[in-house]
Amino acid sequence: LSCESRSAVDWANFFGVSLSENNFQAQLPQSDDPDAGFVGSPDGLEGQLPPNSYGVHANPVAALLHHFGLNAQAVHGYSFDDLRKQIAAGHPVIVWVYGNIWYGVAPAQYTASDGHTATVVRYEHTVIITGYDDYAVTILDGAVAYSRSIPQFLSSWSTLGNMAVILH
């Protein structure tokens, strides 16, 4: 369940900042709210919802990347046009998706112990978008690169509200 750390480290490396995945993961705040910190254990079972092992959303990841000197910004409701502008400028984008860019499903609402409600989905995952053409996006998913059709990507990305980390 450390895809967010893997994506963050790969993204940082693209901009010349060398980070350790284990160190990044260890420095993420812990919380039962994925909008505030990492929920559960990175060694937990996949496909669970909070308060079980789940992962973390964009804001804590961007904040930690910023701590390491990157001008990272978490965005929500980000448009595909804006994502393409980032890619065209040579800036890969970390995105939150459903599974391995599966067609989206209805998300769930989870209320954390502090009363904050977060949108969550089973098999929450992060990947890096590195390119696009008229038909597909190019994805870096750990050590694997692949492409998905734009409609399939948009369906998956919309599940968690078009959440991303961009270079600002």
Regions flagged by a language model, labelled:
Residues L19, Q27-S31, D35, G40, ...:
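Generic preference for flexible, low-structure residues
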Residues S7, H76-S79, V97-I101, G131-D133, ...:
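A mature extracytoplasmic/lumenal domain signature
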Residues L1-L83, A88-H91, N162-H168:
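Cysteine-nucleophile protease catalytic domains, especially the papain-like/related folds used
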Residues V93-V95:
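A short, Trp-centered hydrophobic/proline-enriched beta-strand micro-motif
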Residues Y103, A108-V121, T126-H168:
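Noncatalytic regulatory segments and standalone regulatory/sensor domains
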